[in-house]
Amino acid sequence: MKNIFTFLLLVFIGGQFLWGQPANLVWNTQSRNASESMPCGGGDIGMNVWVENDDVLFYLSRSGSFDENNCLLKQGRFRVRLTPNPFAGTASFRQTLHLNDGYVSVSSDNATLIIWVDVFHPVVHVEVKTKELTSMRVNFESWRYEDRPVRKGEGQQCSYKWAIPDGLMTRRDSVCVEEDNFTFFHRNPERTIFDVVVDQQGMNEVKEQLYNPLKNLIFGGRLSGDNLVYNGTRRGHYAGTEYLAWMYKSKKPTYKQSARIVLNTEQSTVPAWEASLARTEKEINVSKDKQATRRWWNDFWKRSFIEGEGEAGDAIRNYTLFRYMLGCNAYSQWPTKFNGGLFTFDPMYVDQKMEFTPDFRKWGGGTMTAQNQRLVYWPMLKSGDFDLMKSQFDFYLRLLPTAEARTRAYWGHAGACFTEQMENFGLPNPAEYGFKRPASFDKGLEYNAWLEYEWDTVLEFCQMILETARYDSLDISCYTPLIESSLSFFDEHYRQLALQRGRKDLDGSGKLVIYPGSACETYKMAYNPS
């Protein structure tokens, strides 16, 4: 009997192990353009990887790369070319997303190129092995080599949306060319859209109390490789956008070579930013880091999985790929944006009229639309991805002082007011708040038919926090002030409104009346919406 039990247990464990490994995604042909790209990432980094005209390309994005207009900028585009090219004219071409280990490979009979991201350090690795002596060229391609005017329709990528001020620019990046490495970064000035919004919404008296993630923010990185040397620049054009490429090539042909991109994001001076970047470079241990990263992805897939065949199998495959992309932002300071996350691409491949840069996305970069964000995060309870939820919860916790300051400034009572279409610094999106408002209109309200009185979405995230404790017995005590203050706002505010209309602040049953309210963006002047 004991032997039978042991056998059944081994079968069960073995089945669990096999079922928990997602199948690789394999392509046998090259891509036509960036819209046919494959996700790759880890930690808080995401890449769109594709092979076009025998070149391996990838867009590199990192969470939190917000510019002065609150656009979520990409780091840039990288292009890798091998000579002789093992991917040209071969029937053995294969591009694979190795889901269980979290990396992408491009291979043929004569070569393998691997791209992976260190989950625990902001480092991208490119590794090449070939059967014959091969030279490698790595280009950094940037469309932000000069100041770029934000054109009509392009404002959707930033917090101005349709209300772009005259002369609005996306400022150029800074670069530093060395013989064996290339440094690139974007640095926000002291004055950003944060200051514009604070002034617009009458919050200057409490400005110093407000969270400001944009002032002097620097983000970027450094490209280097043991066998790479600078090889000049060239101009080009991709998907309707001009770019400038800085090129590095192999010092000599070899069978094995590599490149790495180390990233850094912080609010500081350029020298301090460079020092942090250098520390990350010194800490790299490729073998150890790769092992730790693959172990993390292996464990990620063991948490939960869904099985199915036929049409269900197709849906499950899409769910698995979506979960992989969420996993690429597991340890970010910022939640995964509902409108593309880290994996947007050139908009002209969606609509040919939108010949905007690869930085473009609708519904903003630093604008958080809570009623959409919740749809990204609710499923994580069922998949067991509680650690991925932390960035969304911490987003609200960081903004708690701003939300409370806002309530005191406008209405003089306690509680945290979190609006819909809220910026990453805690105030309503300026376009949605309205630049043209009646002088007598309540300054605490968005002058907007869709968003006025829609401030209950935070309660769903409070409920998510409570559910994580129920699902996984997590300690959520650090979020207690957020939950209590969010609830206090409704009690304080709607009692205040009731007393402005009559002598009683509660109804005949002694219950709070929430009026006027809003059920999502659609049902306005709602009575006790739920």
Please place each PLM-identified region on the residue numbering.
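Amphipathic, non-membrane alpha-helical segments in soluble helical-bundle scaffolds
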Residues: 312, 366, 447-455, 480
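Aromatic-residue-lined binding/catalytic grooves and analogous aromatic/hydrophobic interfacial grooves
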Residues: 21-435, 467, 471-476, 526-530
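Sec/Tat signal peptide C-region and signal peptidase I cleavage site
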Residues: 16-20
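C-terminal accessory segments of proteins
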Residues: 416-423, 431-466
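Sec-dependent N-terminal signal peptides
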Residues: 4-15
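Acidic/histidine-rich catalytic neighborhood
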Residues: 489-530
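Extended, hydrophobic alpha-helical segments in both membrane/secreted and soluble proteins
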Residues: 454-468, 479-493
